[in-house]
Amino acid sequence: MSFATSLPRPTTTGAAGFGLPLATCISLSVSHSFSPKFGICNNTSLRLKSKAGSGCYEGIHRSQLAASTILEGHTPINPEVESEKIRLIERIRLMFRSMDDGEISVSPYDTAWVALVEDIGGSGGPQFPTSLEWISNNQLDDGSWGDRKFVLYDRILNTLACVVALTTWKMHPNKCEKGLRFISDNIEKLADEDEELMPVGFEIALPSLIDLAKRLCIEIPDNSASIKNIYAKRDSKLKRIPMDLMHKKPTSLLFSLEGMEGLNWDKLLDFQSEGSFLSSPSSTAYALHHTKDELCLEYLLKAVKKFNGGVPNAYPVDMFEHLWSVDRLRRLGISRYFQVEIDECLDYVYRYWTNKGICWARNMCVQDSDDSSMGFRLLRLYGYDVSIDVFKQFEEGGQFCSIPGQMTHAITGMYNLYRASQLMFPQEHILADARNFTANLLHQKRVTNSIVDKWIITKDLPGEVAYALDVPFYASLPRLEARFFLEQYGGDDDVWIGKTLYRMLYVNCNTYLELAKLDYKHCQTVHQLEWNSMQTWYRECNLGEFGLSERSLLLAYYIAASTAFEPEKSSERLAWAITTILVETIMSQELSDEQKREFVDEFVNISIINNQNGGRYKPGNRLVEVLINTVTLMAEGRGTDQQLSNAWKNWLKTWEEGGDLGEAEARLLLHTIHLSSGLDESSFSHPKYQQLLEATSKVCHQLRLFQNLKANDAQGSTSRLVTVTTFQIEAGMQELVKLIFTKTLEDLTSATKQSFFNIARSFYYTAYCPADTIDSHINKVLFEKIV
């Protein structure tokens, strides 16, 4: 029996491509009735209504409407929503163009230390009277000073500092009395506070302020157990501070000099950065008080002017702001609107990049792993040449720290180091060590439910960490990451912890969140309409009769839509999904060698005939017909019929001969996507293209083998397998990452290179994630509404 007669044949065949009837028209109606498991529409929002029920095959050229329905997609958007979207984009662009030394909230604590400085000209008055004015104008109703988020450590420290400053200059006794009442009512409650929320250097700063208050005859209740405990911590920490070392080389102690005694200012002044001590206004104000140094004065005058009398807890914070703002745009899925601004941001960061890393501000003499990790990750993602040497000073004995010499493990610092380590190139062993260390640490914190950070109070840090651990970089589909981060990102409500609580206005910003939600909703609408079209195509092609399930259909579309998610990439997205579906359908057929040969021969021969006579010859086999119609419609208007036919012929030959289908499928998908996107044909022979093609197809072959081994495992060890992939796969992905994220002379475009990573990532995702996890992701990405 020949293959042409062995498969079920429909009694009526659609004449148009994809098996659809001729003269298809479109009728839109909104519906959100989805299957709870897979999100499959019960009432499709996009109906394809036939005006001609059937007919003989008269050529693909008559099916333009069906082609536009499936392959061009739809991008409906309310004009008012579009106008709001444009407004938000312009607002964010203006924010980025105005970036300078950092938009950050004022710290009452630091402002009080600045206000304490006596006029260096000898008048006996305050050097910065506007700082006293700021303090006077910013007391809260309960008598305290501090951030709008109530954290007692922050309120006590800020309030005592402001009371000391006002009392020193004999100003506003009523405000001082009100502040002292707040302190008296709350200071004993410090014993009940979560120590993870304790500001930087609190155990040094609070006793110093209490001692200052006593000299001013301010009565502070200091006999409570909580205060005695803080004094004990102060004494213990001071004993551990290497005073000789801090005078010999820069350390993080430069950030918290205020109140410390026995300092050699002549030596410490050598460690200034643009006039400041680690960009700390309070530390620099303390230095100015003792030294009358002109550089300290210039730095503080600039800061006080910038913030209208107040000063932040750190300034500048330009590296911090530039990097974290870019990171937020990327993770929210809106970075494509700001490519120019992102390039400018990263050019700025790279200008101050060193092989020892960076700090939160430029030209600092101390570096930290958090900023260095974020900088390394983003710079490498955008093709900058960065060395792994930046991580050497943060590693000791197999462990990694936030700041050299301090073996502290702040969650966000370790989280960002973990994210950076996943961009390793081959043989970058220190990144492998960093990944193992941080993954283990974060996992332990997760299982003990102790993901609380010392640097930030954010909406859902446990969720961010969980996503990073559960969906590694190689498997993280762009729309999936954005969907999760939309729920994790707190916008304006996120607050950072320094010496006091503070806000980074261009990092944690509701404007980003508003745009991201509008953009996601628009993309999701487009995807749902396309999915409805896909279901109609599936039914009209009778693919279910060939054994293809609707779950497989949905998975194929989800993978494509989660990666090439932009509305304008509809052709690429649908070509990707449909190619995947047809590959799976053909592979699922149980055919003899002869039947495979007949299938391939019929495809090749009819493709040649149709290319010669305009597409008038109808195949005898229904599945061959669907395939030929599909290829023809994908190429329609692009003149790529022959190239697509050849790509399919190569895959079919591999299938016929029992060759490596994982590798062949990757090649087919890449050629299809590139032809659908209009990539110039000359790029296919580019040396870098060939390198990427080889590396991608190789790793996809390994991933498909691994996935098949998982599926066929009869010993119940799937749970173990899904947590780790083979060494060969990891090495292959590292090599691919190096090829994609390294810029060379006469390189391919970033978008073209990224497409290779997208295909490899989709294979990795399906091999790595369990089926039930993927099902939950499908519902979340495609069908759950954004609130």
Curated annotation (Swiss-Prot):
The keyword Lipid metabolism does not apply. It is an enzyme of class 5 (isomerase). Its cofactor is Mg(2+). GO terms for molecular function: isomerase activity; magnesium ion binding; terpene synthase activity. Changing residue 200 to I: No switch of product outcome. Substrate binds at residues 237, 454. Changing residue 314 to V: No switch of product outcome. It comes from the Eukaryota. A motif (DXDD motif) lies at residues 368-371. Belongs to the terpene synthase family. Tpsc subfamily. Involved in the biosynthesis of clerodane diterpenoids natural products, including salvinorin A with potent agonistic activity on brain kappa-opioid receptors, thus conferring hallucinogenic properties. Diterpene synthase that catalyzes the formation of (-)-kolavenyl diphosphate from geranylgeranyl diphosphate (GGPP) as the first reaction in salvinorin A biosynthesis. This is (-)-kolavenyl diphosphate synthase, chloroplastic. The lineage of its organism: Eukaryota, Viridiplantae, Streptophyta, Embryophyta, Tracheophyta. The gene is KPS.
